[in-house]
Amino acid sequence: MLQYGVLICGVVPVRKPRDIEKALEAPVTCLELRLDYLEADLAEVRPLLEHAVARRVVIFTVRRREEGGQWRGDEEGREALYRKLLELNPHYIDVEAESPIIGEVAKIKGKAQLIASRHDFEKTPPLDVLSQWAKKAAAVGDLVKIVTYAKEPGDGLRVLSLIGAVEKPTVAFAMGPAGAYTRVAAAALGSPIMYVSLGEATAPGQLTADAYYAALLALGITPSGGGLPALREALDWVDGGLMYLLKKRLEVCRDMGRLKKDAGLPIYDDVREAQVLRRAGDFKQIFELVVQMCKAVQLVA
């Protein structure tokens, strides 16, 4: 198994206090709390933000609309919000590299690591443009984040080439169906942080945490480190990946049941399920339960 130090970060659009409470129940070690979505007063969510910082690695982000965010105020108001958020001592803050406030935020960030980001939700520019973006972000940020939209798989390769190309740790991947593979490849190439959905996707092609864990495990990638913390995280990955695959199997069983029913064919396939049980080996009891669940799903399809 290959160990990588990638930080799996659940992205949370924070509108109300309950959004933070729910996120803290998720099996992820990092939370990006998107406060550009905030509908409540900051004072109302502040205690929960402090609690989140104490329990998880936390990124505070107030994304402007030009780069896919929901912030409706001016830059002066956004800078003021970042100042208040920095009082909570987050591990990271994310500010767009092209934002006029990034220089001031960099001066007051304290111990927080500044992620200087750049997003293009429409296309993937040529490599020379991407390289310029990365260099400019590296000049002000502790980490670089470059995310574009892939219209074809080759677009994703250009973005991935930024990882390791500048002197700062670089997060780089592509959005959209054609770029979905880059979200997994980036982890293998050394991206320090990767982002997953905890229910509500905030970007095209964003994978759920469970789907992402399944993909990493399929490639033999496991959490880095040793001792109980690493083992607990590894177990979260396995549990999440297993739940994702079981849900997918039930969905396929349901679709098969409907098609067979419409065609007048026997709904339940004993031969196929017997093959599954033979392959299950030591996990036969678990898969017997899965088989029975699939049988029930097909019968009611």
Curated annotation (Swiss-Prot):
Record keyword Cytoplasm present: no
Residues annotated as the enzyme's active site: H119 (proton donor/acceptor), K145 (schiff-base intermediate with substrate)
Catalysis: reaction(s): 3-dehydroquinate = 3-dehydroshikimate + H2O
Pathway given in the UniProt record: Metabolic intermediate biosynthesis; chorismate biosynthesis; chorismate from D-erythrose 4-phosphate and phosphoenolpyruvate: step 3/7
Binding-site residues, 3-dehydroquinate: E32, L33, R34, R63, R183, T202, Q206
Start and end residues of each Chorismate mutase domain: 222-301
EC number: 4.2.1.10
Keywords noted in UniProt: Amino-acid biosynthesis, Aromatic amino acid biosynthesis, Lyase, Schiff base
Signal peptide bounds: none
GO biological process: 3,4-dihydroxybenzoate biosynthetic process; amino acid biosynthetic process; aromatic amino acid family biosynthetic process; chorismate biosynthetic process
Region annotation 3-dehydroquinate dehydratase: where it falls in the sequence: 1-221
Domain of life per record: Archaea
Iron recorded as keyword: no
Enzyme class: lyase
GO molecular function, one term: chorismate mutase activity
Assembly description: Homodimer.
Role noted for this protein: Involved in the third step of the chorismate pathway, which leads to the biosynthesis of aromatic amino acids. Catalyzes the cis-dehydration of 3-dehydroquinate (DHQ) and introduces the first double bond of the aromatic ring to yield 3-dehydroshikimate.
Family according to the record: Belongs to the type-I 3-dehydroquinase family.
Protein name in UniProt: 3-dehydroquinate dehydratase
Annotated organism of origin: Pyrobaculum aerophilum (strain ATCC 51768 / DSM 7523 / JCM 9630 / CIP 104966 / NBRC 100827 / IM2)
Gene name for this UniProt entry: aroD
